[in-house]
């Protein structure tokens, strides 16, 4: 869009590109929402042939979830985008804004961005497509590290990609450190501790598929089966705490909508263009209509005409989607990563427990809970993604109402596309294993099946995470950032600290504050280039792999030398990042 508008010499190219970016981003958030849950329908259908999964179930759940996400987020736009301006890093929005501005201005700003984009893109493309060096460096590279991992369950990992390094720079050292501390608490305390205290035990009360003792598992397995659930509990409780803290904002947003519905407010007439949202009357009416459509969808399709099940389901979906909208937006504003899968997993667990209590269980209950989870997951994914678009528009002077209106169009097209593609991919490849194995959806299926069969969930682990979030809040430590670190894999958290440390280094080397600021801004340009280049070439590499072009030598990647090569390449990338950021004039 930037290139085409520049070549065509459009007068309002920047504003148009903001709208285009906002529409185009719909596909990513709709896919993220759908792919975490809805493939689980096909996974369970393979075990329960009596289950029916249709295109309309996938399409409607994605569409209605996306629309709800937009409608529920708009009342909170002003708080996250304007009122809290300068208090959240908004890493993804920062990177995209730099790309749009550089495309508009060209010259001195475009050159470092394009150079970093080419370097970061080529770097990540080489790793993903050719495998010249390993994507991750781990302490398993040597025999001592391997023994430490197997005996003590201690392991250190770092993703050596350019995109994640750039993301860490924009997040900054403060939040990156909190996220990393959460990750280290899980990987270096909880995982080894579980092996030490429960080494001879088989903890499978909530997952009968677990047959190994804790001591015989790898650190990664202990994290996946147990420790990650503590992070999920922490995210859920941090979300509840966030809801309580932002209750006045929620109340004022609902109050404003109620006033406008009653025709008692004309405040919108005095609002400047760059702060003008869609009318709260439109939002309220749109929300009611959408929820009615969800009720009809649930009643006639998912719940098979059971009114009680339908009413319970809509209360759960509407309540969780609305309340956790602020959590999704907050997570994106801090670290650029939406913990939507964790929140959706909690939604599925809650939905399953409640639906079983009202008499819906078995395969039909699995379908109902997964479709409910699909609506919630897509709504939260859309809310998190859209707050990024709105922040970009805020920085670049766009009219929020226009972004909001066009977002609905992108949602409709994306939902239809996702539904069709998902059915084709399931029939062609399947989601249970192989090239298109959907790990999050498989996890959802693994959790929901025993719940609907009356087995249970890891409530104790969720409770530990919840208590930890409360303690962190009392200690004035951002609980959501810490819990995100507990949930996100270690190898993705360490690069955030590395990038944040680079940010701190280049902005503190001089006694001249203006020079430090210039260096920081130059680093932001380079980080944005790393993110954009890495993301773009990642898509190209994935398309090649999907098309059957696999040029990676697995034998080489299994060799310890590939990890040493990764460390050298990563060090060179960091050196370039620092040198280029320091060189401002």
Labelled PLM ranges:
Residues 1-585:
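Alpha-helical multipass membrane-protein architecture
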């Amino acid at each position: 869009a930037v290139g085409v508008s520049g070549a065509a010499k459009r007068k309002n190219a920047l504003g148009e590109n903001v709208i285009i970016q906002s529409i185009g981003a719909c596909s990513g958030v709709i896919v993220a929402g759908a792919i975490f849950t809805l493939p689980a329908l096909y996974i369970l259908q393979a075990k329960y042939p009596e289950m029916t999964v249709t295109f309309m179930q996938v399409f409607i759940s994605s569409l209605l979830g996306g629309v709800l996400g937009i409608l529920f987020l708009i009342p909170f736009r002003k708080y996250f985008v304007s009122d809290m301006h300068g208090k959240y890093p908004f890493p993804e929005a920062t990177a995209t804004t730099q790309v749009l501005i550089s495309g508009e201005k060209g010259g001195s700003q475009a050159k470092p961005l394009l150079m970093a984009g080419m370097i970061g893109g080529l770097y990540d493309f080489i790793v993903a497509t050719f495998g010249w060096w390993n994507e991750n460096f781990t302490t398993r590279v040597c025999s001592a590290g391997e023994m430490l991992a197997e005996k003590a369950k201690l392991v250190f990992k770092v993703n050596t990609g350019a995109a994640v390094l750039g993301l860490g720079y924009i997040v900054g050292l403060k939040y990156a450190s909190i996220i990393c501390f959460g990750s280290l608490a899980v990987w270096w305390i909880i995982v080894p501790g579980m092996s030490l205290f429960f080494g001879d035990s088989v903890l499978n009360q909530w997952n009968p598929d677990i047959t190994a003792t804790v001591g015989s598992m790898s650190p990664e397995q202990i994290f996946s089966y147990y420790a990650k659930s503590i992070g999920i509990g922490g995210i859920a409780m941090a979300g509840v705490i966030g809801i309580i803290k932002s209750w006045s904002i929620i109340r004022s947003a609902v109050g404003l909508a109620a006033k406008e519905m009653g025709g008692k407010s004309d405040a919108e007439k005095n609002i400047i263009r760059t702060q003008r949202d869609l009318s709260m009357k439109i939002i309220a009416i749109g929300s009611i209509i959408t929820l009615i459509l969800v009720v009809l969808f649930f009643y006639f399709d998912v719940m098979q005409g059971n009114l009680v099940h339908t009413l319970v389901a809509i209360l759960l979906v509407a309540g969780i989607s609305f309340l956790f909208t602020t959590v999704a937006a907050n997570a994106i504003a801090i670290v650029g990563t939406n913990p939507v899968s964790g929140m959706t997993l909690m939604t599925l667990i809650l939905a399953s427990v409640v639906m079983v209590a009202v008499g819906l269980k078995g395969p039909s209950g699995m379908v109902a809970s997964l479709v409910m989870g699909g609506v919630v997951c897509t709504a939260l994914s859309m809310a998190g993604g859209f707050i990024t678009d709105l922040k970009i528009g805020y920085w670049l002077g766009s009219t929020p109402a226009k972004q909001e209106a066009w977002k609905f169009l992108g949602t409709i097209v994306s939902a239809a596309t996702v539904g069709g593609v998902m059915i084709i991919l399931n029939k062609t490849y399947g989601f249970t294993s192989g090239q298109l194995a959907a790990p999050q959806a498989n996890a959802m299926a693994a959790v929901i099946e025993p719940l609907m069969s009356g087995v249970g969930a890891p409530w104790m682990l969720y409770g530990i995470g919840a208590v930890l979030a409360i303690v962190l809040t009392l200690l004035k430590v951002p609980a959501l950032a810490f819990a995100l670190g507990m949930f996100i894999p270690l190898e993705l958290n360490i690069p955030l600290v590395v990038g944040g440390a680079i940010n701190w280094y280049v902005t503190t080397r001089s006694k001249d504050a203006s020079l430090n600021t210039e260096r920081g801004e130059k680093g932001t340009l380079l980080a944005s280039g790393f993110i954009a280049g890495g993301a773009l070439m990642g898509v190209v590499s994935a398309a090649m792999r999907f098309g059957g072009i696999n040029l990676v030598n697995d034998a080489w990647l299994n060799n310890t030398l590939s990890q040493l090569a990764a460390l050298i390449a990563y060090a060179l990338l960091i050196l370039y990042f620092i040198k280029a950021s320091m060189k401002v004039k």
